[in-house]
Amino acid sequence: MKRIIPILMTLLLLSGCATQSAEKTYRQITMEEAITMMEKETGYIILDVRTAQEYSEKHIPGAINIANESIGTEDITELPDKDQLILVYCRSGNRSKQASEKLVKLGYTNIIEIGGINSWPGETVTGDK
Protein backbone atom coordinates (compact mmCIF):
# COMPACT_ATOMS: atom_id res chain seq x y z
CA MET A 1 0.00 0.00 0.00
CA LYS A 2 2.89 2.35 0.82
CA ARG A 3 4.22 1.91 -2.73
CA ILE A 4 0.89 2.50 -4.43
CA ILE A 5 0.24 5.92 -2.89
CA PRO A 6 3.48 7.53 -4.17
CA ILE A 7 2.91 6.01 -7.61
CA LEU A 8 -0.67 7.31 -7.72
CA MET A 9 0.46 10.74 -6.53
CA THR A 10 3.14 10.85 -9.22
CA LEU A 11 0.67 9.85 -11.93
CA LEU A 12 -1.80 12.44 -10.69
CA LEU A 13 0.88 15.13 -10.69
CA LEU A 14 2.09 14.21 -14.16
CA SER A 15 -1.40 14.13 -15.61
CA GLY A 16 -2.08 17.59 -14.17
CA CYS A 17 1.10 18.97 -15.73
CA ALA A 18 0.51 17.48 -19.15
CA THR A 19 -0.40 20.03 -21.74
CA GLN A 20 -3.40 19.23 -23.79
CA SER A 21 -3.45 20.60 -27.28
CA ALA A 22 -6.57 22.67 -27.57
CA GLU A 23 -8.41 21.78 -30.74
CA LYS A 24 -8.65 24.87 -32.88
CA THR A 25 -12.22 25.56 -33.77
CA TYR A 26 -14.79 28.26 -34.39
CA ARG A 27 -17.82 29.32 -32.39
CA GLN A 28 -21.43 29.24 -33.52
CA ILE A 29 -24.06 31.76 -32.47
CA THR A 30 -27.56 32.65 -33.65
CA MET A 31 -28.32 35.58 -35.90
CA GLU A 32 -29.99 37.34 -32.97
CA GLU A 33 -26.82 36.90 -30.88
CA ALA A 34 -24.80 38.20 -33.84
CA ILE A 35 -26.92 41.36 -34.01
CA THR A 36 -26.37 41.95 -30.28
CA MET A 37 -22.64 41.38 -30.73
CA MET A 38 -22.49 43.81 -33.67
CA GLU A 39 -24.19 46.48 -31.58
CA LYS A 40 -21.55 46.11 -28.83
CA GLU A 41 -18.35 45.23 -30.71
CA THR A 42 -16.25 47.20 -33.17
CA GLY A 43 -13.53 46.18 -35.61
CA TYR A 44 -15.22 43.01 -36.81
CA ILE A 45 -15.66 41.75 -40.36
CA ILE A 46 -18.89 40.28 -41.70
CA LEU A 47 -17.97 37.63 -44.25
CA ASP A 48 -20.51 36.39 -46.80
CA VAL A 49 -19.24 33.11 -48.29
CA ARG A 50 -21.95 32.70 -50.95
CA THR A 51 -21.34 33.21 -54.66
CA ALA A 52 -20.90 36.72 -56.04
CA GLN A 53 -24.32 36.48 -57.70
CA GLU A 54 -26.03 35.52 -54.42
CA TYR A 55 -24.19 38.33 -52.66
CA SER A 56 -25.32 40.94 -55.19
CA GLU A 57 -28.95 39.83 -54.83
CA LYS A 58 -29.02 40.36 -51.05
CA HIS A 59 -26.45 40.66 -48.27
CA ILE A 60 -25.95 42.05 -44.78
CA PRO A 61 -24.86 45.71 -44.90
CA GLY A 62 -21.09 46.04 -44.61
CA ALA A 63 -20.40 42.39 -45.47
CA ILE A 64 -17.54 41.45 -47.75
CA ASN A 65 -17.87 38.57 -50.19
CA ILE A 66 -15.37 35.75 -50.46
CA ALA A 67 -16.97 32.62 -51.91
CA ASN A 68 -16.51 29.45 -49.85
CA GLU A 69 -15.14 27.69 -52.92
CA SER A 70 -12.27 30.20 -53.16
CA ILE A 71 -11.13 29.67 -49.56
CA GLY A 72 -8.35 27.13 -49.73
CA THR A 73 -4.86 26.66 -48.44
CA GLU A 74 -3.44 30.13 -49.13
CA ASP A 75 -3.73 33.29 -47.07
CA ILE A 76 -6.62 35.58 -47.95
CA THR A 77 -5.49 39.11 -48.78
CA GLU A 78 -8.88 40.58 -47.82
CA LEU A 79 -8.45 39.12 -44.31
CA PRO A 80 -4.90 40.07 -43.29
CA ASP A 81 -5.43 40.03 -39.49
CA LYS A 82 -5.84 36.43 -38.38
CA ASP A 83 -6.90 37.52 -34.88
CA GLN A 84 -9.67 39.87 -36.03
CA LEU A 85 -13.27 38.95 -35.20
CA ILE A 86 -14.88 37.50 -38.34
CA LEU A 87 -18.61 36.73 -38.49
CA VAL A 88 -19.25 34.18 -41.24
CA TYR A 89 -22.58 33.51 -42.97
CA CYS A 90 -23.99 31.99 -46.16
CA ARG A 91 -27.52 31.20 -47.33
CA SER A 92 -28.59 28.40 -44.98
CA GLY A 93 -25.58 27.73 -42.74
CA ASN A 94 -23.86 24.85 -44.55
CA ARG A 95 -21.21 26.77 -46.51
CA SER A 96 -20.52 29.08 -43.58
CA LYS A 97 -19.61 26.05 -41.45
CA GLN A 98 -17.31 24.75 -44.20
CA ALA A 99 -15.70 28.16 -44.63
CA SER A 100 -15.26 28.59 -40.87
CA GLU A 101 -13.46 25.25 -40.66
CA LYS A 102 -11.17 26.25 -43.54
CA LEU A 103 -10.42 29.64 -41.99
CA VAL A 104 -9.44 27.99 -38.71
CA LYS A 105 -7.11 25.64 -40.61
CA LEU A 106 -5.54 28.73 -42.22
CA GLY A 107 -4.76 30.07 -38.73
CA TYR A 108 -7.65 32.47 -38.11
CA THR A 109 -8.36 32.53 -34.39
CA ASN A 110 -11.55 34.53 -33.90
CA ILE A 111 -14.14 32.99 -36.23
CA ILE A 112 -17.83 33.02 -35.39
CA GLU A 113 -20.26 31.19 -37.66
CA ILE A 114 -23.68 32.86 -37.60
CA GLY A 115 -25.67 30.65 -39.98
CA GLY A 116 -27.56 31.68 -43.07
CA ILE A 117 -28.99 34.91 -44.38
CA ASN A 118 -32.35 33.12 -44.63
CA SER A 119 -32.53 33.54 -40.83
CA TRP A 120 -31.24 37.14 -40.79
CA PRO A 121 -33.89 39.33 -39.10
CA GLY A 122 -32.16 42.61 -39.92
CA GLU A 123 -31.83 44.84 -42.94
CA THR A 124 -30.28 43.60 -46.20
CA VAL A 125 -28.92 45.46 -49.20
CA THR A 126 -28.36 44.61 -52.87
CA GLY A 127 -25.47 45.23 -55.23
CA ASP A 128 -21.78 44.51 -55.25
CA LYS A 129 -20.92 46.58 -52.16
Cite the ranges covered by each PLM segment:
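Residue-level signal for mature regions of secreted extracellular proteins and peptides
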Residues: 10-11
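Structural scaffold elements adjacent to functional motifs in cytosolic proteins
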Residues: 45-48
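Rhodanese-like catalytic fold shared by cysteine-dependent sulfurtransferases
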Residues: 3-6, 17-37, 53-84, 91-129
